[in-house]
């Protein structure tokens, strides 16, 4: 039964009609897995947001806009009008829905993009793609919208980031030719390198907010995957400082999970 949604049988050929309903023992887990695959636009419930949190989240958006302006490169400037439009799009589509980490979705997206800005400030397309990727992944915003409203370079980045399901796939053969050409590769907007920046920024942000997750196995998996795969990728292709940040965040996340598990076990015993 664990492999199916359930079983339903009606007994109508009896004096008292009865209904037999059989559900898998892990029905709640199955339901949660099904719901997480749905675009959040399909999930109508929004979590309560205090006036302070709402004000803080709007401040995050404004600070990100100012942050981007400071990092804009003369040779290939970031279009602040495009950034403003993307921030508005985030608010419209995400509303006050939350990520599994407990963060408001649009606050999380901006936090990830902020890391991308710090790492690849002279590549505007990668920054735009880091904002659009989460929209396409988690909402009903179609890829065709990205293709029609942004240039094909941005579309290609979003498409390639969406194509990564497992972090093992980040170690793409095309990255082998980079060697010590990181700065040149960023300027040339090498697609797989851009994908790596976005995915590792996403991972670093989520690990840093591990305390907000309620499903601890998910955090443990992220942390272990980071230590075995992501840290090596960052050290090999990007910057040792990024690798160090990922390792530190992963180890801290594992400690958070361990402490939470101990508290939960203690509560059960009491």
Which positions does each model-derived feature cover?
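Active-site helical microenvironments for divalent-metal-assisted chemistry
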Residues: 2, 6-270
């Amino acid at each position: 039964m664990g492999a199916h949604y359930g079983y339903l049988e009606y007994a109508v050929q009896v004096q008292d009609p009865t209904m037999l309903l059989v559900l898998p023992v892990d029905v709640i887990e199955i339901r949660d897995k099904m719901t997480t695959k749905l675009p959040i636009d399909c999930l109508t419930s929004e979590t309560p947001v205090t006036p302070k949190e709402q004000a803080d989240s709007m401040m995050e958006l404004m600070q990100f806009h100012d942050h981007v302006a400071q990092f804009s490169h003369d040779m290939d400037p970031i279009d602040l009008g495009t950034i403003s439009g993307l921030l508005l799009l985030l608010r419209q589509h995400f509303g006050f829905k939350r990520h599994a980490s407990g963060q408001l979705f649009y606050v999380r997206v901006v936090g990830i993009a902020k890391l991308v800005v710090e790492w690849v400030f002279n590549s505007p397309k990668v920054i735009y793609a880091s904002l659009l990727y989460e929209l396409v992944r988690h909402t009903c915003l179609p890829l065709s919208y990205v293709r029609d409203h942004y240039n094909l370079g941005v579309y290609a980045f979003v498409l390639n980031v969406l194509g990564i399901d497992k972090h093992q796939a980040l170690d793409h053969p095309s990255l082998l030719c980079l060697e010590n050409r990181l700065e040149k590769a960023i300027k040339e907007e090498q697609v797989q390198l851009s994908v790596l920046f976005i995915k590792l920024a996403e991972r670093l942000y989520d690990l840093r907010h591990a305390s907000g997750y309620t499903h601890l196995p998910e955090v443990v998996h992220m942390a272990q995957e980071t230590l075995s795969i992501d840290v090596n990728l960052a050290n090999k292709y990007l910057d040792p400082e990024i690798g160090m940040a990922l390792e530190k965040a992963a180890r801290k996340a594992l400690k958070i999970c361990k402490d939470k598990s101990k508290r939960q076990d203690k509560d059960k015993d009491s």
